[in-house]
């Protein structure tokens, strides 16, 4: 089955637009993006893994986590939730950080919107970067390929969790 996956970089707007369709129930897809135990199973591009130190999914709450390489190298990030409309939309500020939770600015604003159509869930993600240099560095470091791998990890995980 071919599921929609669109990934567009708009350098002039310092924004990345992503649309991804999943063959799963909206509530399950929502949980996959908002629950640490599920996020850690798919969000890191293989062979890296994700390790959440803490996550408080509420407005003003934060998620502090690391992407861990097979050699044990950790790349920390912090996310602060700025808006949540359950099972519809959430927004967060994302920045790399050190292991002591000190953010490395500039960061980026992420806006996730969830909808259901014909039994499938569509996730629209808009990533606005505070600086073009940050966005270019993010892409240069392999963000596009890594994010696509993560979305495929999620698709495979959902296939195992969601039986129609």
Which residues does each PLM region occupy?
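Short, highly charged C-terminal tails/helix-capping segments
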Residues: 158-164
């Amino acid at each position: 089955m071919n599921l929609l996956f669109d990934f567009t970089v708009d350098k002039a707007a310092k924004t990345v637009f992503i649309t991804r369709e999943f063959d799963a129930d909206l509530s399950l897809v929502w949980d996959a993006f908002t629950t640490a135990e599920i996020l850690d199973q798919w969000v890191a591009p293989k062979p890296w893994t994700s390790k959440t130190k803490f996550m408080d999914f509420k407005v003003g709450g934060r998620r502090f986590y690391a992407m861990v390489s097979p050699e044990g190298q950790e790349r920390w990030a912090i996310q602060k939730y700025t808006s949540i409309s359950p099972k519809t939309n959430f927004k967060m500020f994302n920045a790399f950080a050190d292991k002591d939770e000190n953010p490395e600015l500039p960061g980026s604003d992420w806006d996730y919107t969830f909808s259901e159509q014909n039994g499938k869930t569509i996730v629209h993600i808009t990533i606005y970067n505070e600086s073009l240099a940050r966005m270019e560095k993010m892409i240069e470091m392999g963000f596009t390929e890594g994010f696509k791998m993560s979305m495929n990890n999620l698709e495979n995980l959902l296939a195992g969790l969601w039986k129609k």
